[in-house]
Amino acid sequence: MMRTWMVYVVGLVGELYGSQVEETREMREMKEALERLFSRRLSDSEIEMVESLENGGNFETRVLVPVIFHKDKVVVSPAARYRDIEKEERVYVEEVIRRLRSLVWHSMVYIYVPKNNDWIMDLICKVSGMSSPQRLDDVALYKDTGGNCGMKFVDLVNKMFKQNADMLKKFGDLLSNGAETRILELPDSLSEDERRREVEMLQRVKEYGKMLCTEDKQKEIVEAQKIMCDACEQIWRREEDRKEFTMEIYSRYLNMKVMRGGVERDVEDPLIDHMDHYMLISTHKKYKCMDVVAELVRKVFVEDKDIEDSDVMSAVCSVRERKRLEEMREMEERKRKEEERAKNEEELLRMVEREEREKREESKGRGKKKRGNRGAGESKEESKGRGKRKRGNKGAGESKEEDRGEEGGVEAEDPLEEMAVGEAWRKKKGSGEKRISEEHHYKVHSRVLRWKKDAGEIKRELDEGYEKKWKNRSIEEIKEQKKVHDIVEVMKLLRDKEKCDRFFVRTGKYMKGKSERWKMVANGILEEGGEKKVGKVEVGLFKGEGGESVVYHLMFRPTETERTGRVGGSSFGKYDDVDEIKKEKSSDMFGFRYPSGVRCEMTSNRNEFRIEYRNRKNTSEVLRTLTILRIPET
């Protein structure tokens, strides 16, 4: 949802360059300011978005993401209580909470209205300052256990929304009256067309103000945030969902940091995200299932898009499929336990039978010994008796050996619990070997290896190839694409299971072009010529005919291309823009060496994997740097 992002950026431009811009040159000034901010020219889609905002404003509804981030980790999760926060992070968290009520208020009422933003922002601050809740000690409220375990962070957020709702009517009245006054005060010097546009915009502001005065709108804002908090709490319970969610939060913080020129803020406020209140509430009412709402929130947040009907149905289908698989696993687990119980009972019966047989054999052996001692008077008979006893003892010995052999045979079979564990271990080991094979050994498709070549050769191959979207590209375009696609060194990170799991999140599998596909995604920063771009490192994989995992897509996707929906859309989406994958030659990359001269240098630690690409002719010159960042701690 590029619109969400651009609303923030346009607001940030006002913060960095001053909110008062000469209205006759406002559009050009805004574009120039944004280009200075991005250190590049705006794309056509970005210019279109800025023009749309400048012409139509932004009245979209918003929600607050109930998570506090500090540096590269989550320090307060949705369900966190004050006692759960690490002691060294509490001072930072308390400072965030002191600013939280103001942020909540802005998320409830902020709108972007070109040429009118100054007086609206002044009004937002004025009403917020007039409110009595502003003087409450929110830190003490969060700390207070009240004889129990204390409130969760989502409870604190919801409480602030409810308290701030009392100010909505006052703000709505002032906003509506202010818009009406400005309609009456429009200068006569405006052309008919300019006057019409100004009246239309101010009329929208007036209607918005009146809407805020209604009880229905006030309830909607509070209810939507409550649903958002519950959804985030639900997301946090599933590890894979939590990882994706926090990676997207981290990505947005990185973008803000880069746009500020790397200037660190003392405190980073929780994120505000544009989300359709009506769709959120109606989905919750219709399905009465927080799993569905949580899946919907996760999907639209990590894919950074507006809620559409198709997203709701996708969330419903995902939850149903997940529950079906969980039920299957539960059924298999019950079946396994039943089989284990039956084997235990069988083993117990065998043990009882063995003990009874041993007792009978022992009793029989004692009886033979007594009968052998009765004829001990005569030497001949004694001699015969001794012979008989010897033979009898020999028989007894054989019987005991047989018993020991039988018993030894049973002992050779592990006790049932050990057998079950052993069998499970063997199965686990087998599946583990398969998993290691998938995660450690990849083949790389020729469409990925192509980007190692020079731009001219790449262009020739693409023009002669089967992928229509790559045909007839200019050399300049190919060179730009090479910067984000020629990153095959990432394979070194992928082969190390421990590191790979620390940096990359795996997305769900999907079918396309008769092949099963999935992605691995990590946050990254690409630096070149003093410019930094935040984005995602994407790895696209499919299952080869021999069951091996083949990397068919590898690139760094800058945030601006992801948010404008270009080049395949969101990194986390279950789709890609590769329609067909030809059965071309793949390589496992073992033994690969670049031509003479240093091409790149790789360094890593627990938090980042860094690749520096150097000029082969002058190895001291760094051409570009790709830094892959660890999944944030949660």
Curated annotation (Swiss-Prot):
Compositional bias (Acidic residues): 408-417
Report the superkingdom from the record. Answer: Eukaryota
Positions of the region Disordered? 354-438
TM spans (from-to): none
Instruction: Tell me which Pfam families the record gives.
Output: DUF1609, DUF3654
Q: Which InterPro entries match?
A: DUF3654, UPF0329
Q: Where is the composition biased (Basic and acidic residues)?
A: 354-365, 397-407
Cysteine-cysteine disulfides: none
Q: Which family does it belong to?
A: Belongs to the UPF0329 family.
| Name of the protein | UPF0329 protein ECU11_2090
Give the source species: Encephalitozoon cuniculi (strain GB-M1) (Microsporidian parasite)
